[in-house]
Every structure is written in structure tokens, then in C-alpha cells.
Amino acid sequence: MIVLTGHSLTIAEARRVIYDREPVAAALESMEAVRKSRAAVEQAIASGRTIYGVNTGFGKLADVRIDGSDLEQLQINLLRSHACAVGEPFAEEVVRAMLLLRANALLKGYSGIRPVVIERLLAFLNSGIHPIVPQQGSLGASGDLAPLAHLALALVGEGEVMYQGQRMPAIQALSQAGIPPLSLKEKEGLALINGTQAMTAMGVIAYLEAEQLAYDSEWIAALTIEALYGVIDAFDARIHEARGFLEQAEVAERLRRYLDGSQLITRQGERRVQDAYSIRCIPQVHGASLRALRYVKETLEIEMNAATDNPLIFADGAVLSGGNFHGQPVAIAMDLLKIAVAELANMSERRIERLVNPQLSEGLPPFLSPEPGLQSGAMIMQYVAASLVSENKTLAHPASVDSIPSSANQEDHVSMGTTAARHAYLIVQNVRKVLAIELICALQAVEERGIDQLAPSTSQLYHQARRIVPSIVADRVFSRDIEAVDAWLKQQAIRDRLAGGASV
């Protein structure tokens, strides 16, 4: 059971809720803060104060005062009018993350809602009711209005959801689950949609997969190093201590560990003095990506526990309008993730080239073909890797430097954070496929060298991966192999498989 406080949710805990479906509850003390915030809103309404989004219109219509008899209708109108996102729906794990993060943000007690709103979000999460939320349509300020409106509509029994493996009207799922539809009070519609939970949810998913790939890429690279008689001296601890980047030194240490006991690695000057950069500079490049990912994690965990509503309601009764909904911190972090993880594939594709190019492969068969000429072997797999890394370069264009005015120029700078997060996720999927191709090629290459000469660690990787993809003895439809290895890499991290002896 994960207990949400609004202040301490971690990515590790979020993972358990998103993927393992661990139940979630709200901390009692946080719910008390929510009640106090709601009381402050009700007092402000009773006193006749003008409060944005409570008794006014929205965006450029903020100066329009709404009659007291229409305040609840205002909130449902907001959800309906803003639920106009388009495109394919977010995956269920992203929607689960959105539900989790919105509930956690509201538990901070700055949004002026009733506790029942949070209870409904958690009921959806714990019951496995996942609103259908189209991916496109958010500018990332004021938060993720369109996607979150689709999420919130399901709470009131409108829109569609996935429930028990079926797509159905939200009201039908609520009936089957025994959950009454929510009736919105003042401020609650705005509180549900004014936040960055779509981009942050997508960012958490992208980060979790990117982090796994960062570590997996080192294992796969180690196998390639052996296949190419790599020079181990480049990973000497003294080199990396001399520069001072912790992550670079960590990558070098892991490579030394993975390659310990190998009979295929060479020493400086034995076959050549030094390797090409895609081998020699693995610690420097992969380490830089890992360093960037750690910044991304820090940013996401701050945002996961942030109040991103507007206005914010404080315990002393103050109602302050600000801009915490602006997604720029997450947008920049997602753009950084895009660059960091794309670089892993850039390096991997160059190592693939060295495995298949007879001028670079230290005597391996051209394109790792069992019968070069008659059989093309891995030739086109390198093409596919080249295509994917080139696509990544387009996707990695920063979204956060793009802005377009909206709401009659009232919202004249936006973050495009959800676009950044969506593209980050696409890049991660491409990177995994490139690494799958490198692994397939490296497996074939080390067979040519002699698998009895592998290091103990890479030997484990070889034998586990060979259960997924067979040796290349003749040309076949290699897309199936790539898909199988891609799925294998996504299912569980290599380090977890080898450390725990997990079955595939």
C-alpha cells in the first residue's frame, strides 16, 4: 500500500502503482489540509470575493463575473469545453500515472476541493478504471488542460474509459464498479485540469524506460567490445578519475566488471593502440547521458509533489493567482532526456556498423553473413538502426523553445512540455530497437570469436539472449528477431535478469 501525502511520492513508488497496481490511499493529515483549504474557498465565496475560476470565467474571460447560481455549472462546462484533445489515447500506464499524480498534487491542500474528489481519483486507480485520454492538444500551460479534462470527465460519468479490458462509457464502468459519479462543486473542475500531470506522467514512463536502457546499453556494449577485441585500457579507473565526472567513472567501472575474465579483450598496443570513439568513449558518452537522466529524475520528483493549480488557496485564507501550472521545468527536462537517450542509440548504431563492416570488424564475416553474397546477413539491420537514429534526431528537436500564444494572447508563452514528453517516449522506443539490433549482431559476432572466451558476465548475457533469438545460419525475416529482443529488453532490465537469474 502506497500512502500519498502530497509531499513525498518517489518515482520508485510511482512505478509500483503504475505497473504493479499496488493499492493507494491518502494520508489522514493530508486530507485534513484538503478540508481546511475547502473551508477557505467556501468562506471566500460567502464573503463575495472575486476568485479566478471559482466565480469568474477562464483564460481571457477571467474578468467575466459568474452569478452564484451558475458556479457549479461553470465547472462542468469547463470540463466539457476543454475535453477536445485528439489523437491516439495514452497507454493505460500513462493514465494510471496521471490519476496518481493528480491525486498527490491535490493532497497538498492548495486547491480548495473537497476530499471526495481525491477519493474518486484513488477509487479509479485502485479499481482499474482508466479514462480514455487522447494524446494531442496540450500546450503545457495552463498545464495540460485538454488531456486532464478527458481524465476528469470520467469522474462525473461522462466520456469513455477502459475497464476490465473493455472500452465503455464512463457511466457504465462506474455502475459496474459501484462508484457513484462525482458532482462538482465550485473550483473543483478547474482544480482537476489545471496542472502538469499529463506531461509529468508521460515523463515518468519515459524516464523509467530510459534509465533501464542506459544500464542495458552498457551490458550490450560490453559484448560488442569483446567481439571487436576492444582495448580495455580505455576503461582504466585512473583515466576517469582524472576527469571527475562520477557517472563516467561508474560506467567505466561497470565495463571493467562485465569484461573481467574475458579472453577476447586486448591491451593497449597488442592489436592496436586505441579503439574508435564508439568503443573507447563509452564511459564519457554513456556517462553524460546517465548524468542527464539523474537531473531528469530530480526534476520529475519535484514536479510529482508540486502544487500546479491556479489559484492556490492557503491555510490563512489567502487566494493567490500565479503560474505554477507552467510546464517549463518538465519541458526542459524532457528535451534533455530526448538528447541523452538518443545519444545511446547514436553510439550503438556506430558499434553496429563496426560489427557488420568487414573493413572495421577485425576479420568478422561481411555483415555477419553465414555465406556472404548469397546471404545478406545483418546488412539491412544496420539500415534499420540508421533509420531509427536519424528519426530520433528529428524528434530530439527541443519542444521547450517553441511557444505559441493562446487564449487571445493572455497565455502568450507556453511550454510545449507534453509534446516534449511524448517525443521523449517515442525516442526511447526507437533506442530500445537499436540496442536490440546491436545485441543481435554482437551475439552473432562473439560466436565467430568463440563463446568459450567470453567474460563470465557477458557469457550469462549471451546464453540468456540466445533463448530469445537464435543464431543466424541463413537469411530470415529479421524484423521478428528485433521485435522479440525489443520486447525482452522492455520486459526486464538485463542487470535484473543476470543478478537474479530471472527466467525469460
UniProtKB/Swiss-Prot annotation:
Classification via SUPFAM superfamilies: L-aspartase-like
Record's GO cellular component terms: cytoplasm
GO biological process: L-histidine catabolic process to glutamate and formamide; L-histidine catabolic process to glutamate and formate
Catalytic activity: L-histidine = trans-urocanate + NH4(+)
Known pathway: Amino-acid degradation; L-histidine degradation into L-glutamate; N-formimidoyl-L-glutamate from L-histidine: step 1/3
Cross-link (5-imidazolinone (Ala-Gly)): A141-G143
UniProt entry tagged with the keyword Lyase: yes
2,3-didehydroalanine (Ser), modified sites: S142
Post-translational modification as stated in the protein's UniProt record: Contains an active site 4-methylidene-imidazol-5-one (MIO), which is formed autocatalytically by cyclization and dehydration of residues Ala-Ser-Gly.
Enzyme Commission number, as recorded: 4.3.1.3
Subcellular location per the Swiss-Prot or TrEMBL entry: Cytoplasm
One Gene Ontology MF term: histidine ammonia-lyase activity
PROSITE patterns the UniProt entry points to: PAL_HISTIDASE
Keywords for the protein's UniProt record, in alphabetical order: Cytoplasm, Histidine metabolism, Lyase
Chief location category: cytoplasm
Keyword Lyase: yes
InterPro entries reported in the protein's UniProt record: Aromatic_Lyase (IPR001106), Fumarase/histidase_N (IPR024083), HutH (IPR005921), L-Aspartase-like (IPR008948), Phe/His_NH3-lyase_AS (IPR022313)
Family: Belongs to the PAL/histidase family.
Name under which the protein is recorded: Histidine ammonia-lyase
Organism: Geobacillus thermodenitrificans (strain NG80-2)
